[in-house]
Amino acid sequence: MSKKRLYEIAKELGKESKEVVARAKELGLDVKSHSSSVEEAVAAKIAASFKPAAAPKVEAKPAAPKVSAEKKTEKSEPAKPAVAKEEAKPAEPVAPKTEKVAAKPQSRNFKAEREARAKEQAERRKQNKGNNRDQQQNGNRQKNDGRNGGKQGQSNRDNRRFNDQAKKQQGQQKRRNERRQQEDKRSNQAAPRIDFKARAAALKAEQNAEYARSSEERFKQYQAAKEALAQANKRKEPEEIFEEAAKLAEQAQQVQAVVEVVPEKKEPAVDTRRKKQARPDKNRDDYDHEEDGPRKQQKNRSSQNQVRNQKNSNWNNNKKNKKGNNKNNRNQTPKPVTERKFHELPTEFEYTDGMTVAEIAKRIKREPAEIVKKLFMMGVMATQNQSLDGETIELLMVDYGIEAKQKVEVDNADIERFFVEDGYLNEDELVERPPVVTIMGHVDHGKTTLLDTLRNSRVATGEAGGITQHIGAYQIVENGKKITFLDTPGHAAFTSMRARGASVTDITILVVAADDGVMPQTIEAINHSKAANVPIIVAINKIDKPGANPERVIGELAEHGVMSTAWGGDSEFVEISAKFNQNIEELLETVLLVAEIQELKADPTVRAIGTVIEARLDKGKGAVATLLVQQGTLNVQDPIVVGNTFGRVRAMTNDLGRRVKVAGPSTPVSITGLNEAPMAGDHFAVYEDEKSARAAGEERAKRALMKQRQATQRVSLENLFDTLKAGELKSVNVIIKADVQGSVEALSASLQKIDVEGVKVTIVHSAVGAINESDVTLAEASNAFIVGFNVRPTPQARQQAEADDVEIRLHSIIYKVIEEMEEAMKGMLDPEFEEKVIGEAVIRETFKVSKVGTIGGFMVINGKVARDSKVRVIRDGVVIYDGELASLKHYKDDVKEVTNGREGGLMIDGYNDIKMDDVIEAYVMEEIKR
């Protein structure tokens, strides 16, 4: 069987869905909402419960015999009274509900009533057919019962089922009759419907008629007054007419003034529609006798009335009239002139550079025009939106008699201010702090051995277990005093820290082997220490060896500016043996003595500041940074800004790997809790709260990103004159590397003699040998050139120079170096060509051919070697020969070039001293486009 939803039933019956849902629940059906579906028979049952509302005039007489029949069946079947009562229950609460509804006047839905009547007739026919069918089945059952004879129990069940169906049908018919009777009562009691549209139309017609009558009366009155005035004017003289017109004008003005003063009383019913009124200033002409006259005249009058009604309309009475000569505003009293309030000038004025005239006027409560006038009298042409410098603002305040003070703006993201501010430290709270010592020197001179000896034999007393975690720095105790050693051996880390402005080292221990003497890296370490302005303690190591000569070491160091105190210098010399732990105590005592002379002090009461020694990313801990506290005390949970990152100190460990909660001045600790790993050499500072630390860290990261995007403008020979002219450079720093010591001395002396406009050349470092990575690092830190005289940079140094944007100039004639430097400083440098290295090759084998010369078998290791390129022969980093190729072959074929990874043979024009492992550098001269 098909199903129906409750809202479909409601639509068919013309009822609301909620009424149908309520009725279904009253009938005992399990429904939840209007979208619930029921069987077709149940739907018919629900529709039948609403049928009396759709059939107002149905006789209820046939219900009487069925009720009696129902009673008879109840009497004849005493075993079924409960079932009949249950079937009749749903109809009992319906009657009172329909009586309540009948009291309300409702509009009838004739379509729904017709559909309901049609369905009722169809159901009635269906029920009649069902009754006939039941009677036939009953007769068949009786025949079967007669045939079967012995099946008495089955016939009883069939009889009961038949009686139940009859009772059910009788109950339904009874309920239908009751609903029909109630609907008849409702239709008789229903009040007559009110047609609101008809009432509105009648009211409108009445208003239009009233409006037409009033308009006609006004027009007749106007015409009568006009005719009377015309008759009176005919009898009067012209002078009297003029006098009367003047009197009428005066009366009209008086009436208008009264109307303006006395507000009009609003009538209760105002018709805001456009009214057709006769114009008082023109005579109306009747053109009714003409065919087209009235229609045209009516059109013109309506257009004129539209304009007049727009002017006289009362739609927006509150809108101000823009015209000053309006009649309504003519007799109003003028507004009083507002007097300007006098504001006293402030006694003090706090200003910042770049304040505009309008801002100053607002602060001192004066008009901008007044300040512009004063500035004009002072000889300064300015507008109210123009910025003024500090001097002009101070002069302006003097003219007003106000004391001007410049506002000092504090940059919260600037960590460096904590290191330079005098008021940050409390002079009364300063205490002595341990010195920070860095050990430097040549790799093979026992520097690592000295570090191991100090670490293993001088660990802080009371600490058991030794060093369990290497964090880049450690402390030892000597004579009850602590000494902090930075585990940053070598000059590279020291220079990179100095390049970032982190001079955390107080003392440098320079380790020199007594048997080797001064080596190139020793000289570089001396230059780094002098550049950082750090005192040097020389430790002459390996004095236990047979070939040790300490006196020779002292003499060699004196040549490089490191003088012993015995010779009248300021550097302490100690002879030690790190391997046999000889004179180590004397070295530590010397360190404490130098530290005492320096008077190293710190304030442990302020918030901690310091420097990053090293940083890394740990898989389990995240960003881990080793910090050296320089001032103040660092605590766990302190909000901290480190370089361009920020965070909170989550955990803190000392050099022994043990957890600590407090770290004082000159104490190295490893911390976790940063959101990113900082750079070595960055400064750190503790802030008041996490909010300010976060703001400072984010601002520093933003500035670093902007700085990184901007191209770094380093000094070069091309922009040297502009830099000097702008006053940005007072001296030119140069690093000299040459093939022999004589060339180094000659070139240094020649460059130092150049003096242009008070600018001198400063030789930062000079040495013999190829240009290495240390030279590039030093040049990057010192913002210097590198001048190579008959030497070449190593591949690693060349890559680092390109990365750090350090300029390397290579020359073979000394006077060209001097001329180029002079022309650069005088602004006359105009290079036309630039050298470009196109490839490198290594000689694998040599072949000497009589009457031809030496042929070099080579392999290209980088770039290419071209036939028309120039070549240099480099042996051990020193240029041996510079010339051109005589021939270039690949096997037996002459070729124009040999590319990377291929082999070939070459001959150099005018040079036959080619040896194995010589480097052939191929280069071309390219024109520089300016």
UniProtKB/Swiss-Prot annotation:
Keywords: Cytoplasm, GTP-binding, Initiation factor, Nucleotide-binding, Protein biosynthesis. GO terms for biological process: translational initiation. CDD domains: IF2_eIF5B, IF2_mtIF2_II, mtIF2_IVc. GO terms for cellular component: cytoplasm; cytosol. Residues 577-579 are annotated as: G5. Residues 432-599 form the tr-type G domain. Residues 50-67, 129-141, 309-318 have a biased composition (Low complexity). GTP binds at residues 441-448, 487-491, 541-544. InterPro entries: EF-G-like_DII, IF2_II, IF2_N, P-loop_NTPase, Small_GTP-bd, T_Tr_GTP-bd_dom, TF_IF2_bacterial-like, TIF_IF2. Its main location: cytoplasm. Residues 50-195, 260-346 are annotated as: Disordered. Residues 466-470 are annotated as: G2. Residues 68-90, 110-125, 157-167, 262-295, 337-346 have a biased composition (Basic and acidic residues). Residues 487-490 are annotated as: G3. Disulfide bonds: none annotated. It is found in: Cytoplasm. HAMAP family: IF_2_B (MF_00100_B). One of the essential components for the initiation of protein synthesis. Protects formylmethionyl-tRNA from spontaneous hydrolysis and promotes its binding to the 30S ribosomal subunits. Also involved in the hydrolysis of GTP during the formation of the 70S ribosomal complex. This is Translation initiation factor IF-2. It comes from Streptococcus pneumoniae (strain ATCC BAA-255 / R6). The gene is infB.
